[in-house]
Regions:
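Short, glycine-/aromatic-enriched active-site segment of Class I SAM-dependent methyltransferases
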Residues: 169-190
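Short alpha-helix
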Residues: 191-207
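Class I SAM-dependent methyltransferase SAM/SAH-binding core
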Residues: 66-70, 74-124
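A short glycine-rich, Lys/Arg-flanked "PGG" loop and its adjoining helix->strand segment in the class I
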Residues: 148-163
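Conserved alpha-helix/loop element of class I SAM-dependent methyltransferases that forms part
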Residues: 45-63
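A short acidic, Gly/Pro-enriched loop at the edge of an enzyme's catalytic core
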Residues: 123-134
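N-terminal auxiliary segments of SAM/dcSAM-dependent transferases
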Residues: 1-25
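Conserved Class I S-adenosyl-L-methionine
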Residues: 212-275
Length: 275
């Protein structure tokens, strides 16, 4: 068992078995797996697949681009970017179990030639400078306290002119009180939200010039209300396989938005050469 509290939060221990059992219960053959079968479980961020599509369109992804997915989870977004946009995707995640399961699911859908995963720390990325055309991250920074290192590392591995595509939950200005648990943290000890102004300053400090800044908090509130109303008896495949007690956590997200404690932002920033 890991001693890192963030990795521990996302470690189940039997995740692959749970996902495969869920696939069977939902009527799918895990040995002949189609990509669409994983939809209910492979994207655990606001809006699910729709959030991935919106960020990809904002980033203007092009065929042949090499994308680094920081905090790649079960690999759903990475597989989607490779399948729909013709990108090669490298995923990196702190949680060893997520990396292993993402790689196995990717093998089962036949995309392991263009989508790969490895374990790594977002504040100390195991990649060379200027390697990627796009750095992609969704709902990851909320667990990372060392934000200057995070943004510096994402900029370091981006080629000049490359883009950072991020989709994150932020603290409202002034950091109002947030109620726990939430999907990324059981309590405040592993939650590290930045405000919009703090995030913009971090981007600028890393040489990342904002090109798109979309506040989608109002739309997110509706999604969080949906999470709060999930059935007590969940379907075979769903976010409950990764994040227990999702109804309570979804309700706290909605409460955070309603009370003005949270904001949700889609951002694209360009890696500019310092003058």
């Amino acid at each position: 068992m890991t001693s890192n509290p963030v990795e521990a939060h996302y470690t189940r221990g039997d995740l692959l078995q749970a996902v495969l059992a869920g696939l069977v219960a939902a009527g799918h053959d895990p040995e002949h797996l189609e990509a669409g079968a994983l939809g209910p479980v492979e994207e655990f961020h606001t809006f699910g697949r729709q959030g991935t599509v919106a960020l990809a369109e904002a980033a203007g992804l092009e065929p042949g681009e090499h994308v680094l997915d920081v905090g790649s989870g079960l690999g759903g977004p990475a597989r989607h970017l490779a399948r729909e946009y013709g990108c090669t995707v490298t995923g990196v995640d702190l949680t060893a179990e997520l990396v292993a399961v993402a790689a196995e699911l990717t093998r089962r859908v036949g995309q392991d030639d263009v989508v790969t995963f490895q374990q790594g720390d977002a504040t100390d990325l195991p990649f060379a400078d200027d390697r990627f055309d796009v750095v992609w991250t969704q709902h990851v920074s909320m667990n990372i306290a060392d934000k200057p290192a995070l943004f510096a590392e994402m900029a370091r591995v981006l080629r000049p002119g490359g883009r950072l595509a991020s989709f994150d939950i932020l603290a409202a200005e002034g950091h109002p009180t947030l109620h726990f648990p939430v999907p990324w943290a059981e309590d405040a000890s592993t939650s590290a939200l930045a405000s919009p102004s703090e995030t913009r300053a971090l981007l600028a400090g890393a040489g990342l010039a904002v090109r798109v800044w979309d506040d989608v908090t109002a739309e997110a509130a509706e999604f969080y209300a949906f999470l709060a109303e999930l059935p007590e008896e969940p379907p075979p495949l769903g976010l409950h396989l990764l994040i227990p007690n999702m109804r309570v956590k979804g309700a706290n997200l909605r409460r955070g938005v309603d009370e003005g404690a949270l904001t949700v932002v889609r951002c694209v920033a360009e890696h500019v050469t310092p003058t």
